[in-house]
């Protein structure tokens, strides 16, 4: 048993794993409430409402892709036709960059791999897989992927020079990462 000094409630409950970094906890609720808490007290440091900020609606199962901390940024899947992903300043919650568009959010968490000596933020959306520079959001490569709406859930898995993207209803994708320049080839 552990003492509980505070509790937090969300409409529709959270579906994302909280992200803990230093003395902060970052949560993303099912309806798009992105909140930064002080870990020891539960006091809110900043918050954003992704549904309003990105003029979108929750996917069928709500926001369910946990945020990723990279340096001084918190990277999230945010919406659809306005932006697919965005990075926020860890301390203030201010948007640092936004990138991509998608027919639906999907549920795949952002992940970082290194290929061709370059750090690449890999993002999966219902009709494609793409990578951007995690510091700027600038597109590095993109390949089509018909994942049957937003039903993709698992994070891409890297093995050697290959990147495996698992979908739904047998729609999987194997990519070979170029070792000279950021890019991929469908295998």
Region locations from a protein language model:
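Short loop/turn segments that connect beta-strands within beta-propeller blades
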Residues: 1, 38-42, 49, 89-92, ...
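Extracytoplasmic beta-rich repeat domains
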Residues: 1-19, 47-69, 79-82, 96-118, ...
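Extracytoplasmic
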Residues: 13, 29-31
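Residue-level signal for tight coil/turn positions that link beta-strands
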Residues: 22-23, 31, 41, 71, ...
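Ligand-binding pocket scaffold of soluble enzyme catalytic domains
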Residues: 27, 34-36, 58, 97-98
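WD40 beta-propeller blade core
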Residues: 35, 86, 130-131, 173
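A sequence/structural signal of beta-propeller blade repeats
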Residues: 75, 84-88, 95
């Amino acid at each position: 048993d552990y003492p509980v000094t505070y509790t937090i409630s969300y409409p529709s409950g959270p579906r994302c794993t909280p992200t803990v970094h230093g003395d902060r906890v970052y949560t993303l609720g099912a309806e798009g409430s992105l909140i930064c808490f002080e870990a020891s007290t539960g006091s809110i440091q900043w918050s954003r409402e992704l549904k309003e900020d990105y003029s979108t609606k929750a996917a069928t199962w709500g926001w369910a892709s946990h945020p990723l901390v990279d340096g001084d940024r918190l990277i999230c899947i945010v919406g659809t036709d306005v932006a697919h992903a965005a990075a926020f300043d860890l301390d203030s919650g201010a948007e640092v960059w936004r990138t991509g568009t998608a027919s639906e959010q999907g549920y795949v968490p952002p992940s970082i791999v290194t290929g061709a000596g370059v750090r690449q933020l890999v993002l999966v959306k219902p009709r494609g897989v793409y990578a951007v520079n995690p510091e700027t959001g600038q597109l590095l490569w993109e390949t089509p992927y018909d994942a049957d709406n937003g039903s993709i859930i698992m994070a891409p898995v890297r093995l050697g020079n290959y990147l495996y993207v698992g979908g739904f209803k047998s729609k999987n994708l194997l990519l070979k990462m170029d070792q000279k320049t950021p890019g991929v080839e469908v295998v």
